Amino acid sequence: PSGQDGIVGSRPERYPMERDFGGIYTPGVTVFRQNEAKGYGLLAEPFKVGLVTVAAINHPQCVDPTHMTPDCVQGTLNKLRTVLRLALRAGHDSLVLGAFGCGVYDNPATQMAQLFRQVFDEAEFKNKFRLVTFAVLDNGKTTPRNPVGLYQAFANVFGRRD
């Protein structure tokens, strides 16, 4: 094997997740810029965060515009569990999550929010996090897979808190 397969594939002890649903935890990433609304200016006091990286399914197969096939649902659930497991193993009690593939990867947003809710309600994860925030833009954009928009899809499932 060559490339990443040669590194990751031969080192399963470093990446204990299933290969198809694996993820990477990166501790101590320095945040030193402000947000877009502030022109990405430099922060007066940079801070560090831990990052969990798990790839969402790219353009999943769907049984209708807003629902993935059972295989894609199961794969997505496994990926969401990986995100939460990595965060817990690293000792985090607060999360900032994105819409997990509901943008250019075209995952159905309402179903994705429901799948997040389902995983957070599982015994392994229920009440394990002090704070969970979804960083989902309210840009008003809708698509056939996201007829209410990303923000509204997540707000409908989790409620809105500013």
Task: Describe the residue ranges of each PLM region.
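Macrodomain-like recognition of ADP-ribose-binding/processing modules
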Residues: P1-L95, A99-D162
